[in-house]
Amino acid sequence: VTNDIRALFAVTAVLVGSVVAQDAQAQSKPRAPLTFRDSSVRHYKLTARASRIDPRVKAHPEIDFLIESKTGQPADVQQAAVDTRVAPRGKLVIWLMGHNEALFDRLNSYGLHAIRVHYANRWFSICCRENPVGEHCRGNIRLEAATGHDFSDDIQIPKPDGMMERAYQFVKWLARENPQAGWNYFLTGDGQGLRWDDVIMSGSSHGSTTAARFAKFQKVSRVVALCGPRDHLQSWQSLPSATPENRYFGFSHVLDGGWVGDHYCRSWELIGMHKFGPIVNVDKVQAPYGNTRRLITDFDVKGDARRAHSSVVPGSRAKKDATTGAYLHEDVWRYLYTQPVDVAGKAVPTSDACNKNQRQ
């Protein structure tokens, strides 16, 4: 089956899967708000190997998707965190990038549960290297890596090794090992899957692109794309979306290479984020930023594009107070992950200056 035909299958799967998921959730019993039953409230930080949780997990060395490194170190460690001292919002963030403890601390302080799962994300330097790359190549690989279903001819990721199943198995494990933290809230009534309507997909760079691609296929609570999405030669951004357009949020630095090539403006507009407000500079406008979905920063990174790329994530390259060292984008991160999705800015036209057809 060619990648073009698989792309058509993916569109059909979005439409059918979305209806099935909505029907299943409509038939489930209404849930009471999540509350913690923890006699000793605290900030929990847990780790577990995917291969220990699920014996079906396998390595895929052909795409550098490993269980152990070449030196024998565990490569499939997954992280989870929740703070039972904070009133829970009943939302689970699935983070698609390397573990970022500073980010997880902030997510937990907002009342969010957070996990990072081990999934196939190193294929990018191995697959779809032809020039020009097929318009569905990377998008289909992202979807297969996320779902464990056969969307691509270039990789073979079975269900146990897809992000969806690994996230589900991890949450099941957390519900057993850390029951006082309410992880079972995110399992379906029959315990056979995750309640994706309560999941926030998020990532940075490569991970933010996969998060957005997955949300086109599976309806989720929201998407937070930090320094992304990219895939400027791919067409998935304009596909029908199972996740409503108002649930996509983005934040990037203007000196990031994704702006030089119109990658970000293209993805943001094709996804439909312009329908909920203009691009807003968070260094010039205070929260809630006109309730827009498209945020940028232009703080001084000394012309360093590499720093600019990762400056929108908590860490050494983020904007900080020169005296205290405190992060200066705290309000931005809180907004991205907690702004009510039904509160949005006014639509603006797409930009003629942004090149949306980069395959010409």
Segments the model singles out, each with a brief description of its role:
Residues 1-9, 20:
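Bacterial N-terminal signal peptides that target proteins for export
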Residues 27-89:
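A domain-start/cap signature at the N-terminus of enzymes
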Residues 89-98:
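Short beta-strand element of the alpha/beta-hydrolase
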Residues 111-128:
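Conserved alpha/beta-hydrolase
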Residues 136-192:
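Alpha/beta-hydrolase active-site loop
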Residues 202-207, 211:
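Gly/Ala-rich beta-loop-alpha elbow adjacent to hydrolase catalytic centers
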Residues 221-319:
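The feature captures the conserved acid-bearing segment of alpha/beta-hydrolase catalytic domains
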Residues 306-359:
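Catalytic active-site module of serine/aspartate enzymes centered on a nucleophile-bearing elbow/loop
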